[in-house]
Amino acid sequence: MTILHSTDFFKAGISTVAIEPRLPQSAFPEHHHDFHEIVIVEQGTGIHVFNGQPYTIGGGSVCFIRDHDRHLYEHTDNLCLTNVLYRAPDAFRFLAGVSQLLPQEQEGNYPSHWRVNQTVLQQVRHIVAQMEAMGSETDTHAVASREILFMQLLVLLRKSSLAEEATNNDARLNQLLAWLEDHFAQEICWEEVAAQFSLSLRTLHRQLKQQTGLTPQRYLNRVRLMKARHLLRHSDESVTDIAFRCGFGDSNHFSTLFRREFDWSPRDIRQGRDAILQ
């Protein structure tokens, strides 16, 4: 597994924060690093496999990666993101208590993936741009200023996370997408789901297309297919059982969609024939 080292990203030993844009981020094999990072997705779509679990990410997704986590990107489509790197929650020169603003693991569950709406994403971009504009300056004032901006970023993300009440269509769409990650196997009636999150069906179609480039059904199928591929790789269940478990009522239709999405059949994945590309 590839290991990324802080010495390659932090310009000087005194630096505590670094910015690494990926415009776009292509598929990248599984890796981990000896630093922490916050991944901010600006646009496009892709699959983020985090500690073995696949997540569909798009504009507004925010991912919190710790130094012992492993992750990879695949199936990317114009995925543009910015990585905000920091050495560790307790490795700042002028900040204390940073961990209180970060996701907290509870009973083995680490809420690593958040979403913010487009308005907040613009504010995030502004803060990151200020950090990036400072370049590699390492004098005391520059380090302090960069850490202040990092704290502003954390506070903004925390306040804007899904724990906040959905008060506009962007926030409601984000909550709907998070709900789909947990309920993808259910029979979905889009009119009912849209109403559940106080969205009109027309608004749902328009905003999801803008944020992910996909229609609601295409997005749902992609989530289902990603979950199915994970099970094919990491379980002994039959292809038919996995198809039904992931929300497909017909295993032949599932196999057709699967091959169209990944250029491999479910049997190929089960037998590891795609491993050479991983």
From Swiss-Prot:
The record's subunit annotation is: Binds DNA as a dimer.
Which HAMAP family does its entry note? HTH_type_RhaS
Compartments reported by the entry: Cytoplasm
**Top-level division of the source organism's lineage:** Bacteria
Pfam families linked: AraC_binding, HTH_18
Q: Which GO terms describe its cellular component?
A: cytoplasm
Q: Relate the protein's function as given in its record.
A: Activates expression of the rhaBAD and rhaT operons.
Q: Biological process GO terms, please?
A: positive regulation of DNA-templated transcription; rhamnose metabolic process
Enumerate the UniProt keywords alphabetically.
Activator, Cytoplasm, DNA-binding, Repeat, Rhamnose metabolism, Transcription, Transcription regulation
| Principal cellular location given in the protein's record | cytoplasm
Please identify the protein, giving its name as recorded. Answer: HTH-type transcriptional activator RhaS
Which NCBIfam families does the protein's record reference? PRK13503.1
- Give the source species: Klebsiella pneumoniae (strain 342)
What are the site positions for Interaction with sigma-70?
241, 250
Residues that span the membrane, as ranges: none
